[in-house]
Amino acid sequence: MQSLDSSCQEADFIINDTLKKLKGSSNADHVQGLAVHAHGSGVHQTQFVQYGTSGSSPQLQPQQSYHQLHPTLQQQQFASSSSKSYLETSLLQAIPQIPAQPPICIFDDDESPTEGTGGSLGSLLTEPTSATPSGLPTAIAPSPSSCSSSTTTMSNFNSITSPSPVVPDLLLSTPPGVNSSLSNSSTGAASVSSKKSEKRPPSANSTASGGGHHLHHHHLHQTHNHHVLASPTSSPSKRQKSNSSSKESSSSSRSSAIPAASVSTATSSSQSARAGAGAASSNSNSKPPSSVCQSGNSKFFNLHEKIRDLYLQLLSNDLNYFAETGLKQRTRSFTLERLVDREKLNTIVVNLYPGNKGYSLALHYDEHMVLNPQTNEWSPTDKDETSSDAAGLGTGTGSHRSRPKPLAQDESQSKTEAGHAKHDFGLVEVLRWPYENDLLLQCIDREMLPEFLMDLLVAETVSLSDGEGTRVYAKPSVFYAGCVIAQIRDFRQTFATSTNICDMKHILLRPTNATLFAEVQQMGSQLPAEDKLALESQLVLATAEPLCLEPDPSIGRQAINSQHQRQLYNSHELRRQMKKFTQTAINRKRKLDQFTHHHGLELCDYLARLRQRPRTGSSSGGANATPATAPTNNPLVGAMLSSFTSKVPRRPHEVIRPIRPPTLEYPANLKVPEHVISVEKYAKAYEPLNEFSEACKDGCQPNCRHNFQPQLVEEYILETEREASEGRRALYHIKLSIFQRPSDAEYLGELYVDRDYREGERNGESCRFALGTRVHANRYIQQFREIFTEEGRKAVKITHLIPGHMPIVTHTGLTNEQRILLQQQQQQQQRQAQMQQQQQQQQQQVVVVANQQQQSQQQQQTQQAGQQLSATVHHVALPRQQITQKTLNLAGSNVINVQQNFRQQSAQQQQPQTYTIEAPQQQAAAQIVPQQQQQQQQQQQQHIHLQQLATGSSNTSTTTHQVSLSNGSLVLVQQQQPQQQSQQLAQALQHSGITIQPATIQQQQQQVKGTSVVGANSALRAQLNSNVPILQTQLKVQQQQIMQKQQQQQTTATSNNNNNNNNNNNMNNNTAIHPNPAINAIVNSIMNSANQYQQQQQQQHQQQHQQQTGNTSSNNNAAGSGGSTNNNGSSTSATTLKNSSNASILNLLNSAPAAMTSTPVASGTFTTSTGQQQPQTLTLVQHQQQSTPNTADAATATYVQTTRGTPTLVSTQRKQQSSEVLQNLLNANRKIGGGGTTTTTFRTNSAGNLIAVNLNQAGQSHHQQTGDGSQTVRVSMSALASQLASPPAVMTNPTTSYTVISSGNSAAAAAAWIQSPTGPVQQRILSSLRRDSTTAPPNAIVVGMAAPSPGSDSNASNASGFAVPNNLASTSSGGGGGGGALSALLTNAATPSPSGSDHSQSSQTHQNQALLERLSNVTSNVSAVSMPHMSPQQPQPTQQFITKTIVHSPATSSIHSPMSSPHPQPSASPQQQQQQQQQQTTATLNLQGINLSQLQGAMANFAGLQNVQVQIPGFTQPISLQFSGNSLQQQQSGNTATGAGTAQGQQRSVLVSVPVSSQQQQLPHTITLQTQSAPHHQQQHQQTQQQHAPPTGTIVSLPSSGPGTQTVVITNNSGGGVTAGSSTSGSAGGGGGSGATTAMLTLPIAQIVGAGVQKLNPQTIRTSNVGGGIGIAQQTVQQQTIQSQSGGNSTAAIQLLGTIQPRARNVQVVGTKQLANRQLITTQRQIGGSTLKIATTPVNAANVVTSSANLTTTPIVMSAQKLQLKTVKAPVQQQQQPQQQQQQLQQQHRILNQQSTATVSSQTLPSPNQVQVAQQQQQQQQQLQHIQIAGRATTASGAISQRTLTALAAAKQQQQQQQAAVNRRRSTTDATK
């Protein structure tokens, strides 16, 4: 940065240059055109100095030209021949020595010809210039005036050629050369400066020759040597050119003859060396001879009289001039300058240097009067001698100067003195200060004598030291009438490098009391105190000014005029402004810039400097080039630079026109108009206001112009009800009055606000404000109405009053009557739900009656429910339409059922036959319309606009309902009716920011029967009903289910019901069907804590029993379409299931409002409640039951969508049930791969417990549907918990004891056997898991939570705590496989992610505990699990630890390293490599491009995510990624890749990626993205290749054509890491390393999963704290959107955005970066869970992975070395383009849905966010997120009471604040990632 000075200097330089030329540079004497600058204003007379000797110095000139700095000055050379000869030698010697930089301080001594011989080193060019004062008539005359002392700038004798020694001194206050110490001791210290004999070029010292003339040529030898003063700090290199006033000081560069120059001014009195630190070589004793005051004239020189006389003289001149010319001029402004110039008065010199060189004080001394140390007498030095010494440089001891002029000389005397006297004075700098030390400057500003310098000023001698010793010179007196004249030489505004010109002005420093006191102290230093007082009194009397008894204004006028010119710009305002540009301010700014430097702009700065360099002129050789133009001496470099600079365009000065100075002259072309314009014609005449017309005398009319009182124009009264204290409803009354002032037609507004309005009372507050024009008033009215009514969503009564008209009343939003109706309907629904629950319990025992009958019942019920819901959730018309659709529609309507008010959870359960909102919409168009209506209503309520995307056929539609639970949690239910069309409506319901999209899949559509749907709902209800028991039951049920699923697939749902019942019993009692009393007590306490009604609690208990039976049944029902109803019948008939699921959801919500958070159902159902323990929970439950009658297992299939044929599906489905449980628990988002019914998982942490598990996802791929419709995959929380807790028990041996040990925190959560820790058990579990994978078709889901152990990635994953080798896994029977997979997943999950990979080695107990913890504590209570290592709080540390490990783990660079947990999972990487190798054989998928760090961020969000399996359909072996220790590990998997992520105690969702690819499309779909930073979040996305569904994680599966797809959702509800373990049949179950803190990557399979589900997953991801969400636009089933969620808190998750089209070739993984570029997705990172803008925010995914279109043909291989996703054959761009297009479409849907549901998505993620935050702030965030969900859900739920809205708003605000706080905390970690 160039200092401000430089620019000013350039400009001033140009100005000075022109002035020089104008001012008589023509003088022959000034060969160089040394311009005499008239100093001061006065009369600027340029006096040409004529050098007496004609031969003056032509010869010298060429030499001078070399001197770059002062060529002009140098060339004016010495007139005397003697000077010539001297100069030649001195110049020749000096030229090589001249430093490139100008002498820092150059004092021009105009008057004194400097004789000093120039020392070779110090030789300075001496340029004598004799300036004849303008005042003198004879310019040539050598009158002393020409050497005005004012102008004399003594060359620094300091200027010593060797700058280095001097520099430090310069930095000190004293100039190095000057020994300012006045102390008598004359020490040789001065000699320090440089040992050069003071050589003053004896140039013009011709006393004899030319007499006066020679005297005039005072060659001021200015030091060209920069040394002392030249040192960077110091003096300006400018020579002052004496300005005309009479002082032309020829500034000759005076060779500082006294280079040694330690100058000490000796004060006769012992002045302490105040002046300087230098040598104190002043002999105080020697008194300067009287000759110092040599004027013969002893007469007192009255300075004030002289000034006054001169002023009057100038005044008379001005008056005469005015009389002659009529022009006024003020020539008397510079009276003092004129006087000094005329009288040649002695001055002190203050040099102001540019930049940081500071300012200095310089004193004159008489070079010709030297004190002889022996005799102690003054001896004049002979000038001639020194001149003769010219040849011998340095011989002369001192340059002789003519004696100092007497202090007060008359003009006549001064003239007579001829130049001898004054001009001889040398000048020496004695002190130097930085500008920060401005004491002297302040004194000068105040025109006061500086008392602290009095000793210096009074001193009579100056001692200078050089190599030869110290010489003491006489110092002329500077006092006149007690005042001192200071000559200010300002070098700051001139261009220092080129000239020695300075601006000079003179200031009269007057004595003050302080100086008087200082003098007394000095004079009376030896006197006693009494004498001192007497002396002081006399001095005070003598110096007191006379009293003026006749005041005269002329005195003031004279003072003003004499200062006029100087004070022009000296106003206080200007001075204040100038402080910004003082050197201190500039230094401060430079320092600031230095430390706030923006790195990376160095090149820009360099180019700027280059442009500022002057162009090299014709001197190409550089010989002539000045240093400025030739920056370097190297010709090569110079040539390069010049060629370069010529190419660098300079700033277009030509383009920028200079600003013309303003002129007061009229423009030349301005002329008076020819004809006068009649102003009156156009102006409007107003009669004067004081002369009112007759009509206005008595009083103005209302509209009279004189009336300044505003008149009322119109009024708006807005009234609404608000909740007041004690449940009282207060009237919120706002009156907006619009006034208009008749006088100026201005509109005014008045706003009156009364928050508790009562008729006739005015308790509110009002304010008035100006509106201006009518347009502004209208705009204000419109905006105010929109804001107050929340754009019409809020119920507000608006009354519009216009004087003289009838009032107009309008209403917005829901009125109280409507609200009451809705409430009544909700109550009815709740009652029905209770009935249904009872029926369901009965039905569970009963075999499923004909599915059709139940479906018809359900349809009827759905109609009823829909009607009821319509009241609850802004009119749900869809259910009616759905009823028409029958079974398929019913499946879809499950979501609606959940949507029913969950405030009364039990009541919400509808009759099993009636799926309240489940009935799928038969007619898409009709459904879409109601949905839109509902959405619009919801939007109005919430401010959030939900736009439903009907991408699929009109048949598919989703309805969303918000149900508010008694505990204050909102449940958002989205109904998605499975449509035959593959398109999935992407409806994002925004409930408190949670988006639930029911997934409609072609497969689901194909599954026409709704019984499976009913089953799923019932399971959900059961789970909801029994919080903890559900987990336990599910754990056991899954065991049973695994065994029974096969049976169920073959048999009716009855077996499923039995299994469910068993599972439920297991959950409640570990083994008993009935709920555990302890569990019930926990549930009760949870419900109480949630502020739920006791009724709800009772209902929940009932529901828990029902769910225990009913969950199993519901799961079974979901699994089997026909039989599923019967299965659910264990609690109720299939139709009953709906009710039961509602009741269960209600129970779940009520029991643990926060616990529900972020449990996505594999089907579209997603429940998110972030705050497990918080009463306000928004639970989004999407029940998508796929209508396929037989795909009860489809839900499980959803998990594991069989890559192979349907038969595979059946086994897979069984596995899926177990895996579903895991998914439900662990995955916030789960998508159903198949067309089967989908079930929702609810995980509620009443006390941090997981209460609800995913319901069975009935929907499976079509293949799956064909395989076993009857098979129900029941994912019950109990089963899931059991599996997670005790993998061995859950996995293969349903009979194996699953001791459901509920962790202390949550009764249900610890349903798993922690006993299983033993290796054999682990082996069993592994074997079961492996069995699942091996026996089951690749589709079979192996949900293996690999313990985070280093070995976890290995197939055996022994370290994981799966000690079971692959053999064991294969040994387990296929039938048990599903259970085994779950158990494996659970086992892995069981290893607490917090414990990290290290703990993962610990036995299964560990894993079980982790899973249990996860289950039990969704939020922060992970440790509560019985896991031995885990303390309840460990999960948080674990998460943090994971995050750290990810960040630090070096493994990130290579896939396996990232895949393997960086810490303990080294083994993982080899397995990864193997897997990669296996995959590589078929396809090359290079993951290097992928940035694992982002994945890690996403993974980190999933606390429990440990193993993610990526299965490429074409490959027999899936790739399993283990995230343990925060890293992904790839495990070689058998043919099936199952990703089971189990969150640690905190983790809420398990990522299960089941590759379901139709055999057709197995290869093409899967792309696994790994972020390069392997750290915790590499969830390497489970890559399950699903033909149409991208795997949830970073895996993008591109199903080429197969309708069946998988969704992999890695969700971490709890802060604890989620591990997504995907194990293939061949390989060990997932290697689950603990995942990143909280992130869920959900890559739903868009096609299979209903749009709602897909949306839920991405949204869930989005809601994760940090990360952008995965936005999946659901367009066609085939289209797949992959969004990976950017890591919640700490890490950016990989955002996979965009839909992957069904074409197998298109694999798009859009990295977060691309997303960010597109700004399609909002990253939740900053927003945290609270932001709605998910769609718009760019996701920070470091890499976009696009798999080439060839993916279908070529398998994707993850290279172990780098995580880059390379598509081997297909161009990435092509793929990206279609994908982008799809993404754009999806994103458009998403943006419609997400923006409306953006809030929803963020809340869906919030549970992951909670997971992330959970570690840090799990509970807070969950609460916030719940609140947020509730707040956002308001619009989504069609009917929300005003109270709910307010509660939601409050919750949302709270959450946002907390989220913001969390985000702030996380920002640093995010940045690091």
Swiss-Prot record:
Assembly and interaction partners: Component of the Spt-Ada-Gcn5 acetyltransferase (SAGA) complex consisting of wda/Taf5L, Saf6, Taf9, Taf10b, Taf12, Ada1, Spt3, Spt7, Spt20, Sf3b3, Sf3b5, Nipped-A/Tra1, a histone acetyltransferase (HAT) module made up of Gcn5, Ada2b (Isoform B), Ada3 and Sgf29, and a deubiquitinase (DUB) module made up of not/nonstop, Sgf11 and e(y)2 tethered to SAGA by Atxn7.
> Which GO cellular component terms are attached?
nucleus; SAGA complex; SAGA-type complex
Question: Which parts pass through the membrane?
Answer: none
Q: Which organism is it from?
A: Drosophila melanogaster
GO: which molecular function terms?
transcription coregulator activity
What does the protein in this record do?
A: Component of the transcription regulatory complex SAGA, a multiprotein complex that activates transcription by remodeling chromatin and mediating histone acetylation and deubiquitination. The SAGA complex predominantly acetylates histone H3.
UniProt keywords, alphabetically = Nucleus, Transcription, Transcription regulation
Q: What is this protein called?
A: SAGA complex subunit Spt20
The protein's matches in InterPro entries, at most eight in alphabetical order, are given as:
Spt20, Spt20-like_SEP
**Family from the record:** Belongs to the SPT20 family.
Q: Which GO terms describe its biological process?
A: chromatin organization; regulation of transcription by RNA polymerase II
**Where is the protein situated, by its record's location annotation?**
Nucleus
